[in-house]
């Protein structure tokens, strides 16, 4: 599975940000003179070091929609706390609309076990060992946003200890 072909179109930029197109959809708007065609692009931007964002762009051509999507994704960046094994600190659920995503940390070497837009978001965030399951809706955009919702809820051990007002040693089981 390590040699699996990357999903979507990928561009590597010189400043370390990678963008991947998840979905290109041709949409129409009915106006007085007929139907007006445009394109809606869902894409994910990430630096594979703990920052990731999902953006949507609409324009009359695909290239313009991608540019708008990149700026939208960079406006909605999320920072992900990664562990030493490039996983997440604890299991979490993310919800967006009717889409629900379960994210669970996994053992080193297991890889990203997820599908669709969930996989793309997790890979570009820098997570390398994780189990993810989509529940409810199969909507691409809502599943990507559900992952972001889950990733924003993650807390490290030090943050949890600080919130509870106890030393970090008390959080570890004896």
From Swiss-Prot:
Single biological process term from Gene Ontology: translation
GO molecular function: rRNA binding; structural constituent of ribosome
Top-rank taxon: Eukaryota
Presence of the UniProt keyword RNA-binding in the record: yes
S5 DRBM domain location: 17-80
Function of the molecule: With S4 and S12 plays an important role in translational accuracy.
Keyword Iron-sulfur tagged: no
Classification via Gene3D superfamilies: 3.30.160.20, 3.30.230.10
Name by which UniProt lists this protein: Small ribosomal subunit protein uS5c
Domain comment (free text): The N-terminal domain interacts with the head of the 30S subunit; the C-terminal domain interacts with the body and contacts protein S4. The interaction surface between S4 and S5 is involved in control of translational fidelity.
CC terms in the record's Gene Ontology section: chloroplast; small ribosomal subunit
Organism of derivation: Porphyra purpurea
Subunit field text: Part of the 30S ribosomal subunit. Contacts protein S4.
Keywords: Chloroplast, Plastid, Ribonucleoprotein, Ribosomal protein, RNA-binding, rRNA-binding
InterPro entries linked to this entry: Ribosomal_Su5_D2-typ_SF, Ribosomal_uS5, Ribosomal_uS5_bac-type, Ribosomal_uS5_C, Ribosomal_uS5_N, Ribosomal_uS5_N_CS, Ribsml_uS5_D2-typ_fold_subgr
Subcellular localization: Plastid, Chloroplast
Family of the protein in this entry: Belongs to the universal ribosomal protein uS5 family.
SUPFAM superfamilies, per the entry: dsRNA-binding domain-like, Ribosomal protein S5 domain 2-like
């Amino acid at each position: 599975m390590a040699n699996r072909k990357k999903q979507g179109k990928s561009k590597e930029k010189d400043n370390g940000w990678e963008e991947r197109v998840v979905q290109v959809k041709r949409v129409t708007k009915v106006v007085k003179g007929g139907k007006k065609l445009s394109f809606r692009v869902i894409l994910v931007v990430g630096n594979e070091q703990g920052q990731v964002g999902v953006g949507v762009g609409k324009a009359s051509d695909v290239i313009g929609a991608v540019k708008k999507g990149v700026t939208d994704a960079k406006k909605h960046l999320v920072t992900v706390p990664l562990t030493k094994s490039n996983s997440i600190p604890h299991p979490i659920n993310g919800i967006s609309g009717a889409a629900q995503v379960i994210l669970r940390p996994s053992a080193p070497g297991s890889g990203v076990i997820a599908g669709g837009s969930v996989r793309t978001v997790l890979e570009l965030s820098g997570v390398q060992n994780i189990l993810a399951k989509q529940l409810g809706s199969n909507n691409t955009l809502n599943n990507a946003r559900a992952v972001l919702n889950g990733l924003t809820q993650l807390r490290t051990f030090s943050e949890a200890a600080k919130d509870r007002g106890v030393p970090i040693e008390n959080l570890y089981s004896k």
